[in-house]
Amino acid sequence: MLELKTNVIQDPELKDSLDLQENDRVEIIGDAVHYIVNDHLNRVFNYTVDQQKIHAALITTFASGKKAIVVILDDIGYVYYVGDNNNDSYIINVPFSTESAWSSPSGLYLQRHRSSDENLNTDLPHIFCLNDPLDELTLIKFDGKKILSLFDSIVYVVGEIVVTHNKKEKKLSFWRSRFIDPESDQSIKSSRNRRRESSFSREKNPDLTRSDSIHYTANTRLSEKFEEQGLAYSTIFSHIESFPITGSTSFDSILGNGVLVITTLVKELEKGYMMLFRLVRDRSPYFLDSLQLHAINLSAIKSKHLQKIVVLSSKGKVSLESPMSPSLPIEGTFRSFRVHGATLYLEDTDGVQRYISLDNRASNSLVKWCLSVIRYVLPLREYEIFYTGHLYALFAFKLSHDEAFISSILACFTFFSRDKVHVEPIEDCNEAYSLSSKFHFKKEILIASQLSSHLDYSTFKNYLMPLAITLHFISEELRLDSVVKPRKDQLVALLLQITTWLKWPRYCEYYNFDIAETFLSIPLSIQVDVEEPVGPTSILQWIIECLRSQSTVPFYGLESYGLPHSCSTMFPQTLSLMQLLDCLLNPNMTLQNLVEEMVRLGISRKRCERYPFGILCIIFTVLEIAAEEYSPNWESEELRLVNRLDVDSFLHPKTPKWVFNKQDQEVKEIKALTSTVTDSTLVDTQSFHPYKVVTDMIFREDRRLAEVNKLLNYSSQITIMTEHFDVDLSSVPMQQKVAQCICVRTLSVPIGAGMLTYGSKNPLPTEKVTPRLFNFTLHLHPGTLIIQPNKEFVTQELTEWPEFNVGVALGLSISKFSKEINTSWIMFNRPETLTAYHAGFLFGLGLNGHLKALATWHSFIYLTSKHDTTSIGLLLGLASSYLGSMDAKVTKLLSVHISALLPVGSNELNISPLTQTAGILGIGLLFHDSCHRRMSEVTMEEILASNESELKNEGYKLAAGFSLGLINLGRGSNLPGMSDLKLVSRLQVGISSQATFQSLEAGSPGAIMALTMIYMKTNDLEVAKKIDIPKSRYLLDFYRPDLILLRVAGKNLIMWDEVKADYEWVKYQIPDIMLSQFDLQEKKVLSSDDLLLYNVLAGICFSLGLRFAGTGNPKAKEILINFLDSFIRLCHLPAKTHDERVTAVTVIRCTQIVALSSSCVMAGYCDLDVLRRLRVLHGRMEPVNYGAQMATHMALGILSLGGGRYSLSRSNLAIAALLISFYPQFPRTTQDNRAHLQAARNLWALAVEERCIIPRNQDTKQPCIVPLNVVQKSGAVQKLEAPILLPPYDSISSVSTLGDKYWNLKIDLDNNSDYRELLRESQTLTLMPYDRTSSKEEPLNLFPKLKDTSSPLWNLVKTSRLFQSSNSPLNVASLQESNNKTSLGVKLLLSMDFDNLTRDRLLSLQILLQFFESCWTGVLLNKFHSRQYLFLSRDLVEDLSLRVWEYVYSHNHNEESV
Amino acid sequence: MAQIRQEALKKQKSETQKSTEGFVDIGNLAQWTCSSEKSGFPIRLVRDDNIDTYWQSDGSQPHTIHIKFVKRVSIKYVSMYLQYTLDESYTPSTLRISAGTGFQDLEIVTTVQVEEPTGWVHVPVGDFGRNGLLDVHLIQIKILANHQSGKDSHVRLIKIYAPEIEQPAIAVDEIPYTSLQFISRNQLR
C-alpha cells in the first residue's frame, strides 16, 4: 500500500507561512472583527463602542452582486462593501436576537434566537432573509409539502443548498433555496397587495391566499401579522432529502464533476457521512448516494487540482477521500489535523508537527503549465487519477516535481504493459559514465510501474493519444523559446520514449533528429494498440511552408487530433506566432499593423530576442523598417517595441523637464569647483548655472554670452581704462564724478541681469537663495587705484528701487517649473527685517506663478508691516500669480490698498501713492481678459479724473490705463455689457488736444495705452485714426512730443496686420510735413524743431519691435539697426544750449526705444549686430541718466533672454506686458516713479516664451548638437543647428532632424495639432543614437580582428575554452561596445555556430533563407521593397546560404558514404 | 487813496510796457500750478494784474511754480513782480528757471540772483534759446532761496512774454483744415 509521506515542520514559527489560504475570511476576535485577505489582515472593525456582543460575522454577496462583510450585533448590524470601487457601509436594524447568520446566494439568512419558553404553537417564522442592506427582512416560502418547523435550524449552507437540523426529530434536512425578486415577481406582489386589502376586509374573502398554490409556514393569523409589518417573501425553499442523524457537526463540502459532496461528522458514533448530490443547472439538485465512514474528524481540503475530504480514523490513520477518485492514505498515525488553504497540518502520535501541501506549488513553471494543459485535455475523473499519481510520486516516492511529473505520465503507459518492467542495476563504471551523460528514464519508469500497479489507469486507454499529442505540442511551443532548450530536450526525450512504446515510427524519427545521440531508450511492450496519428506537426517547418507559398497554409493544431478547438489558447506562443505570420503574409496588412499586432499579443522586444534566430531576424527586420516608418498614432508600447524611444518620449513625455536639469547640475566646470577656494569676488557667479551646458551649446562658436554676462554684472568690481577718458582723472572730484556715474550705471543693471538668468534655478527645499549685492568699486586701469563713490552719494533712497529689481531678478531666476516653492520655502528665505530685496523677490516669484502657494495669512503679515516696497512687490506678485483669475481673496487684498475701490466717504487711506499705483495695476493683472465691468469703470474714472494730486499723478493714471487695457485686452468694440460706458469717446477726450485745458493731460498716456490695448490687433481703422497723430504742424504743436511716440506706436499696434517690415511702410507712416526732414543722417545739430520727427520715428520703431517681437525677422532687424545707428550718431552731437539739451533728452530716449525694439525682434537670439551697438550704448557714461542705462541693460537682457533659451511671445498678453515694461518714459533717477512705476518694468516676464529646442541623447540624457530642418507655414525652409531658438510655434509647419548620428525624427505640426502643444510644453527632442554606418560595413566575423591583436592578454583569452563558445563573456563584452547589440549578436551567433548545427537551428536558418528568398516576389516584395537587408546585410545572408548549402551537402554526402 | 493807487498802477504799467514793447503776455495760454500755497493766497493771484495781491507758498523750499502751455510756445521773457520793500524776507533771491516739453525733460535755462528787487524782474530766457526765443511746453520757476533766508515766498505777478507777431494773411499750409470744403473757403476770393 502506497502512502503519502509528510514533511516535519522544523520551525513552528514558520508553519503559517507555508501555504496561503487564498480566499478571504472574517474572524471574530473579542470586540473586533478581522477581515483577512490572502492570510493578511486587511481591515479591523471594532465594536467596543457599541457595547454589544458580536453574534455573527460573515462575507456574502448581495443580490446586486456586491461583496460585503456583514457583522450582526445584538440589535444592529453593519454592512461594509468591500468591492474595488465601492466602500460604502450601512447599518441595518435587527429586530430580534440573532442565533446565527449564514450567507446566501443573494444576501444572508438570519436565524432568530428562540427562547426555550417560547410557545411552540405560535410557530412564528424564525428564519429571515436579507437581500439588500437597504431592504427590509423577508420571509421564506416553501415549495412542496415539507416545511421548516420551529425546531429546524440552519447548520450549513453551500451554494443553493441549505442544510437544517431538527433537534426534536433528530433529522437532517437538505433544502434547495431559490431567490425571487419580490419586486419583479408579480404573483407575490399581488398576493401581498391582496393581503393588505384583506387586513381590512378579511371577512369578505378569507380564503383568497389559500387559493395560492404556495404554502407558507405560519398559521394565517400570525403570518398576516408579519405581513402587516411589511414583510414579504424573497426566497423559496424546496425540500430535497432528509436523514435521521443526530448530533452531527462539522459540515463541509467539496464540489467536483457536477457532484456536490456534503460531509458531516457524528462525534459520538465516530462516524462520518458523505451525502452526494448531483447538481443540475436551473433545476433542483437530486440526491445520489450517501456513504458512511469511520472517522473521528472530517474536513474538506480544496486545492486547485484536487478536492478531497480529509478523514481521521479512530486508529489515527489519515486519508484523503473522495467518492470519485482513489483515496490517498497518509503514512503514519496522527492525533489531529487541520486544514489551511491547500495545506494539511498534522500532528502525529508522537506530537510532531507535520504538513503536506496538495497544491502543486512547483517552482517549475513547465510542470505547472503541462499540468494545466493536461487538466484541459483529460476529463476530470481521469485527471484526478493522474494527479493522484503525481501526488504519490511526489510524496510517497519523494521525487522532484520534474521526475514526479514524468513518472505520472509514464505510469499511464506502463499500466498497459503486461510484463514487469525490468531495469537492470548499473554495474560497471563505463556504463555509469555513459548513462550519466545521456537522458534516460530508468528511475521514473521504475516508479511509474509501481504507480500503475496501485492505481487503476484502465480508463486511460482512449486518452493515450491525446496525452502524447499534447506533450508534442508543448514541445513544439518550447521550440519557439531558445532559452528553454534544455527543458525542451527533456520533454522531447520523454516523447521519444513514449512514441517508441506506442510504435509511432514517424514521430520516433522526428524526435530522433533532436536527441538521438543523447537518449537511451528503455524498451517496453505495450499491449494497447494506439494508431499513429498524422505525421508530427512542426511549427518551424510550417513557417517555412508559409513563407514559401507566401500564404498561411493550414496548421495541424490540436483540434485536428480531435481535441477541442479552444485548446489552442493553452499554447500562447504558437498562437501569437501564427497570428503574426498571418499578419505578415496578409496583403492587406502593413508592417505597421504587424507591430500593432505584436503589441496586442504582448510580445516585447525582450521576448523577440528569445525566438529562434530565423524568426528573430524576420521580426527584427520588420521592426527596423517600422522604426523608420512609425505610425503617428502609435502609443508608447508600439514605439518602444520598434525602439523609437525618441518619438515615444516626445509624444508621451513622462519625465518632467526639471528632472533633466538635475542631471545637468552634476556637470561642473573646474572653474566652478575651484571657485570655492579662490577669492569669491573674482568669480563670475553668473557664468555657471544648470543650463550652462545648453546655453554653451547654443552659442558654441563665440563668447558672446560671456560678454553679455560681463556687461550685465553688477556684483563685481569694474575696471575702466583711463585712456578712454578725455578728462583728467587724477583729481579727486573728477574721480568721484566718474565713480558716481558708474555707480548709477551699475544700479540700472538688475532688470537686464534678471532677463539673462530667467528661469535658471531649481532650488532645493532647503536651499536659501541670496541676492547678489551691488559692488560699486571702481578700478582705474593703468595703476592700482580703486575708488568708491561717496558714502553720502550712495543713500538708501538711491539704492531702494535697484535693490527691488535685484530681488525681482532673483525671483525670476527660479524656474516656472520648480516644484519645491511653497509657503515654508518663501518663509525660509524671508530676512529678519523686510528689505527691498525681499520685496522684489516676492514679486519675481509671483511673476512666475509661485505666489499661489503663499498662505493667505502670510500675505497679511507682509502687508500689515506697511513696508512700501514689500506691499508693492507682494500685491503685484499675487496679482500676476492669479493672472486673469479674478480671485476673490486677492481682489480683497488689492481693494483695501486702492482708495478708488473703497466706498464713497470712507476714511483717507494712509497708503503711499506708489502702493496704490501698484494696486491698480494689480487689478488689471488679476482681471486680465475678464471684461469686468466694475473694474473697467473704476479704472476709466481714475484715468479721466481731473484733479491732479500727489496721488493721482501721471504714473497712477498710466497704471489705471494699463489696467483698463489689460481687463479688456484686445476685445476691440466687442465689450459685453459696457456700451453705456462709452469707453472710446470718453478716453478720446482724455487724449484730445483740449486735454490740457481740462487738466486731463496727466491722464493722456494712460488713455492712449488703454485704447491701444483694448483695440490691440483688431485692425479697427476708426479707433486707430483717433489715436493717430494729426497731420498738420499747427495741431501737432498742441501735443507733448513724448505722447506723439505713444500715439504712433498705439496706432500701429491696433493696425497690427498693416505693419510691414519694409522701408516703404516706414516712410508711409511719417506725416507729409516731416518728410522733408526725414533723413536723420543730415542732422548736424540738435534742434527742438525735430522733436516730433524723432518721436514719430521712435514710435514707428517701437511698433515694429513689438510687431516682430521674438521672430528674428531679418528685415525688421535691418530697419531697426539702421535707425539705431542714426540715433546713436545723434546722441554724440554736442548739446550745449538749452534747446539742444532738451532735444538731447528726447534723442536719448528715442535711442533707447529703438535699441529695445531691435532687441525685441532678436529676443533670445543674442544677435551680434545688435549686441555690438548695445555695448556702445552701455559704454556711455555722460550725459546718460539712470533710465537710459536701464533701457540699455534691458535691451541687453532681452537680447540674451535666459541665455538664449527663451524668446518673446506675441500673444496679446505678451505684447501688453512688453508695452508696460518697455513704456518709453524711463525714470530719470533711481527714485523716479512719477511717469511710470518702476516695479512694472519687470512685467516682461509675462511675455517670455520657452522656444529653445534642445535635442537630448536618449541614452545619456545629455543635450547634443543636431542639424534641424524647419519648414515654415509660408513654405520657407530653414536649416538650423539645434539647440537653437525655433521660430514662433504657430508659424512652423514641421521640424525634422538631420544627420547621421541619431535616428531622424520628423515632427509634422500641421497634420497633428497635438504635436504643437507637445513641442511647446517639452521643447525637448530626445534622440536615439544611431550608427548607420556600422550595420553595413561591419565585418562578418570578429575573430580575424581579434586574432590580429598581439597583446598577451588576448593570447590568453584566445586559447581559453570560454572563447570558443558562442556565449563567452568576451563575446558579450565585445557586443556591448556596439550600439546595435542585437544585430551584431545575431550575426555572430549565426556565423559561429556552424559546427554543431542541430535540426532546430538548421530549420531556423532555413526559415531565414526562405524569408529572404520570398522577399523577391509576391506579398513580401510589396511589403519590403528590398529593404529586407536592413537588419542583416546582404553579404551576410549570401554567405549564410552558401554555408548552409555546404553543410547540407556534406551531411548528405556523409550519410551516403555511411 | 484809490487815486494814488490808480496812478501807481498806471506808472507801473507804463514801466512794464516800456521794456516789453512788441511782446505780449501769453500766460493765459498756460495752466498754472505750484508746489504749495497758503490759503487765501492762491497761485491765481499772480495772474490778476494787481500788485497788491500775491501768491504765498506754504511749505519747505524749494518752491516751484509750473507754467504749462497747451501748445508749444516761443517765449522771450519770464517777468516777475517782486517787492522787497513790502515782502522783505518773503522776497525770493535765487530763482532757477527750467523749461522743456514736459516734466520728463525739464532742463535748466538759467539761475537768477536778485538783490532786493522792487518791481519787475525780467528774465530774458529767450537769450538761452534759438534765435532769441525759447521754445517750451512747460516752464518751471524754482525759488531756491529768499532774502534774509526767509522761508516762504511772495510773488506778486508773473508774466510770460512772447513776441507779438503780426498775424499775416494766414498761410495756407498753416491752416489746420484738411477737408476739401474747408480749404476751398479759407481765402477771400
From Swiss-Prot, chain A:
Question: What function is annotated for this protein?
Answer: Component of the anaphase-promoting complex/cyclosome (APC/C), a cell cycle-regulated E3 ubiquitin-protein ligase complex that controls progression through mitosis and the G1 phase of the cell cycle. The APC/C is thought to confer substrate specificity and, in the presence of ubiquitin-conjugating E2 enzymes, it catalyzes the formation of protein-ubiquitin conjugates that are subsequently degraded by the 26S proteasome. Mutations to this protein prevent the exit from mitosis.
Q: Which UniProt keywords apply?
A: Cell cycle, Cell division, Mitosis, Repeat, Ubl conjugation pathway
Q: Where is the composition biased (Basic and acidic residues)?
A: 196-210
Q: Where is this region: Disordered?
A: 186-210
Q: Where are the PC repeats?
A: 873-895, 959-982, 1006-1024, 1099-1124
Check the record and name the InterPro entries matching this protein. Apc1, Apc1_3rd, ARM-like
Query: What family is this?
Result: Belongs to the APC1 family.
Q: Which GO terms describe its molecular function?
A: molecular adaptor activity; proteasome binding
Q: Which GO terms describe its cellular component?
A: anaphase-promoting complex; cytosol; nucleus; pericentric heterochromatin
Task: Indicate the quaternary assembly.
Answer: The APC/C is composed of at least 13 subunits: apc1, apc2, nuc2, apc4, apc5, cut9, apc8, apc10, apc11, hcn1, apc13, apc14 and apc15.
Gene symbol of the encoding locus: cut4
Q: What is this protein called?
A: Anaphase-promoting complex subunit 1
What is an annotated GO biological process for this record, any one? metaphase/anaphase transition of mitotic cell cycle
Swiss-Prot record, chain B:
* UniProt keyword annotations, A-Z: Cell cycle, Cell division, Mitosis, Ubl conjugation pathway
Checking SUPFAM superfamilies in the record gives: Galactose-binding domain-like
Note the PROSITE patterns from the entry. Answer: DOC
Tell me the GO BP annotations in alphabetical order.
anaphase-promoting complex-dependent catabolic process; cell division; protein K11-linked ubiquitination
Q: Which GO terms describe its cellular component?
A: anaphase-promoting complex; cytosol; nucleus
- Say if the entry is tagged with keyword Cell membrane: no
Give the Pfam families listed for this entry: ANAPC10 (PF03256)
Reading the lineage from the top rank, the first entry is: Eukaryota
Q: Where is the DOC domain?
A: 2-187
The record's comment on protein family reads: Belongs to the APC10 family.
Primary role: Component of the anaphase-promoting complex/cyclosome (APC/C), a cell cycle-regulated E3 ubiquitin-protein ligase complex that controls progression through mitosis and the G1 phase of the cell cycle. The APC/C is thought to confer substrate specificity and, in the presence of ubiquitin-conjugating E2 enzymes, it catalyzes the formation of protein-ubiquitin conjugates that are subsequently degraded by the 26S proteasome. Acts as a positive regulator of the anaphase promoting complex (APC)-cyclosome. Involved in G1 cell cycle arrest in response to nitrogen starvation.
Self-association or partners: how does it assemble? The APC/C is composed of at least 13 subunits: apc1, apc2, nuc2, apc4, apc5, cut9, apc8, apc10, apc11, hcn1, apc13, apc14 and apc15. Interacts with nuc2.
Name of protein: Anaphase-promoting complex subunit 10
- The scientific name of the source species is Schizosaccharomyces pombe (strain 972 / ATCC 24843) (Fission yeast)
